From Swiss-Prot:
<dbReference type="GO" id="GO:0005125">
    <property type="term" value="F:cytokine activity"/>
</dbReference>
<dbReference type="GO" id="GO:0006955">
    <property type="term" value="P:immune response"/>
</dbReference>
<dbReference type="GO" id="GO:0043123">
    <property type="term" value="P:positive regulation of canonical NF-kappaB signal transduction"/>
</dbReference>
<keyword id="KW-0964">Secreted</keyword>
<dbReference type="GO" id="GO:0032729">
    <property type="term" value="P:positive regulation of type II interferon production"/>
</dbReference>
<dbReference type="InterPro" id="IPR002960">
    <property type="entry name" value="TNF_beta"/>
</dbReference>
<feature type="domain" description="THD">
    <location>
        <begin position="62"/>
        <end position="204"/>
    </location>
</feature>
<dbReference type="Pfam" id="PF00229">
    <property type="entry name" value="TNF"/>
</dbReference>
<feature type="glycosylation site" description="N-linked (GlcNAc...) asparagine">
    <location>
        <position position="95"/>
    </location>
</feature>
<dbReference type="InterPro" id="IPR021184">
    <property type="entry name" value="TNF_CS"/>
</dbReference>
<dbReference type="GO" id="GO:0006959">
    <property type="term" value="P:humoral immune response"/>
</dbReference>
<comment type="subunit">
    <text>Homotrimer, and heterotrimer of either two LTB and one LTA subunits or (less prevalent) two LTA and one LTB subunits. Interacts with TNFRSF14.</text>
</comment>
<dbReference type="InterPro" id="IPR008983">
    <property type="entry name" value="Tumour_necrosis_fac-like_dom"/>
</dbReference>
<keyword id="KW-0472">Membrane</keyword>
<dbReference type="InterPro" id="IPR006053">
    <property type="entry name" value="TNF"/>
</dbReference>
<feature type="signal peptide">
    <location>
        <begin position="1"/>
        <end position="33"/>
    </location>
</feature>
<protein>
    <recommendedName>
        <fullName>Lymphotoxin-alpha</fullName>
    </recommendedName>
</protein>
Amino acid sequence: MTPPGRLYLLRVCSTPPLLLLGLLLALPLEAQGLRGIGLTPSAAQPAHQQLPTPFTRGTLKPAAHLVGDPSTQDSLRWRANTDRAFLRHGFSLSNNSLLVPTSGLYFVYSQVVFSGRGCFPRATPTPLYLAHEVQLFSPQYPFHVPLLSAQKSVCPGPQGPWVRSVYQGAVFLLTRGDQLSTHTDGISHLLLSPSSVFFGAFAL
């Protein structure tokens, strides 16, 4: 009679290798002597869940809303301390430009409204061109880059009082330290009121 120990060895040796491999894979890692090699819960998460995001749920996101200064003369000036205008969570206003506090996606918007009493001279009116542009100045560029731009024209032709509005808005990937500013043609025709002329941005 074969001793039990020898019989056990014979049975193992006669087992097909593929069956042994399947049994081994079915065992828990601890039973295989591989304690500590298993994936941690964080490592087992999908890769897209581990990407860093600049803003997490509950984080107060940067936002700014500016309105046109009624004392504007040669160029459109912005202010943030009145008429529901504000600077929040990192945004600041310097040299009439918004300073981006954190890198990320931002919705940038602006509106202006132009108005006039009519076309001059009335006999042979000349075209009047109106334009408004939001510009980006960044350490990556040596000059102002247009982000949003729109143009309108009024006249020629006999007409009475007129009003033209321009609204623009889009999403941009901005970098901390970027500066957002505006350029406007037709300053003398701006209808300066908080609900008509404004400029802002907020993080997404």
